Amino acid sequence: MSFTENIKPLIEEINPSFFEITVGMAFAYFVNQEVDIAIIETGLGGRLDSTNVITPIISVITNIGMDHMNLLGDTLQLIAAEKAGIIKKNVRVVIGESSPETDEVFLSVAEANNAPISFADKIRYTENWVHKNGYLVTDLIDKTNDVHVRCELDLPGYYQLKNLVTVAEVVCHLPALGFELQPDKMLYAFKHVKKLTGLHGRWEIIHQHPLVVLDVAHNEDGMKELVKQIELSDYHELHIVLGVVKDKEIEKILLLLPKTANYYFTQASIPRALPAELLMQKANASGLNGHSYNDVNTALQHAISKASKQDLVLVCGSVFTVGEVRLRGV
């Protein structure tokens, strides 16, 4: 409140968006807390995003998918060009996933800005991953020296393996920027991500028997990864509580979801949410069947009541849908 009160005249003068105000609030908070490192994530794209006023110590682009195409472009190359807008002069950029469609875009922008560039998945990889006691356990291998490091992650979704490779590549460049790297603390951080960061909703198990999982997958690429995770899971029947927002390519998402699941269509309490009844109609057209509920937690309780102890109950489709479950619990 004090932040917004202090800048109220400026808000009235330039009429910033809600996101722009929260970005300013975050920057002010980081300054006041004197943080050593702040991880700033773009809201949408990169080139024109309000977070892009900073000059970072390292730029990171995880991967490129077909999302926000109405604003960023309808090809991977166009979307990559927008994302590449965060590449700054003489500042290293790490690309998480290489791709024939986008590599040249990043290489070209990096060269124009004299920015050192590395592709994480060309330098490191993971193997021998297993789930153990709620953790994702894997070997992280450096291709340049064949060093193997055993890592445990408290984010158990197998898709975190890609993120681990990206993070490891970023971290290895920190000593050159004046930061002391302590491998034991890095491994501790991997194992305690949720506790250290408050990051939730990434194949997050919140209940056993039945297994209740939250995942914020909300676009085509994210849903593809989520479906792979479902296929790797052991369960009797699958119950999916699904709520989405209006501005996503909903039909593409629906076509990816398993038709054998029991669906509980719902909506978060925000204006952007697609009404549950309309979502159900679109889902029916894609061969997905279930009932609609106007409240996320009501939908979840119905799913749990129908599930056996061996079943999997998954809440997904939007950050807002998952967020409402976290507010009230199971």
Can you name each region flagged by the protein language model?
Residues 1-54, 70-72, 100-101:
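ATP-dependent carboxylate-amine ligase catalytic core
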Residues 318:
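Active-site-proximal loop/hinge segments that shape catalytic or ion-binding/gating pockets
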Residues 96-97, 111-131, 153-158, 187-193, ...:
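Beta-strand->loop->alpha-helix junctions that form or flank phosphate-binding loops
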Residues 99-109, 114, 211-214, 220, ...:
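C-terminal helical cap/extension that packs against the catalytic core
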Residues 32-33, 37-42, 50-60, 64-69, ...:
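Nucleotide phosphate-binding/pyrophosphate-handling subdomain across enzymes
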Residues 46-47, 55-115:
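Conserved catalytic-core segment of NTP-binding enzymes
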